Regions:
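Active-site neighborhoods of divalent-metal-dependent phosphate/nucleic-acid chemistry enzymes
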Residues: 64-106
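A general structural signal for well-ordered alpha-helical segments in protein cores
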Residues: 22, 41, 54-57, 74-77, ...
Length: 106
């Protein structure tokens, strides 16, 4: 299972998206290996414009596995944030959460 990040979904869904990204997402979908998480869905819904995009997102929610964002995932994301900050790196909270969601369901 591969958790696909928001930016990759956006590229894959665009008619003029990068072909390399579109191909990779397409292969994951065809092989039943694509996954979403709640935060990726939130980001996609937040950017959805018009009925077509909303229908597409609703279809994705029905058909693509969504990994759960458990309290353990939130704890891991906080711990990752602390480790990153100790090394002078500031990571957006959304990226920390998505990364730990992927890691915990790998």
């Amino acid at each position: 299972m591969t958790l696909i990040d928001t930016s990759s979904w956006i590229e894959a869904l665009r008619k003029d998206g990068k072909e390399e990204v579109r191909d990779r997402v397409r292969k994951l979908l065809l092989n039943g290996e694509a996954a979403l998480c709640d935060f990726v869905l939130l980001e996609l819904w937040n950017g959805a414009r018009g009925d077509y995009e909303k229908k597409k997102l609703a279809q994705m929610e029905r058909e693509i596995f969504c990994v759960s964002t458990t309290s353990a995932v939130w704890t891991l994301a906080r711990e990752l944030a602390i480790r990153c900050r100790k090394n002078g790196i500031t990571v957006p909270p959304s990226d920390l959460l998505i990364a730990e969601c992927a890691e915990s369901h790998h």
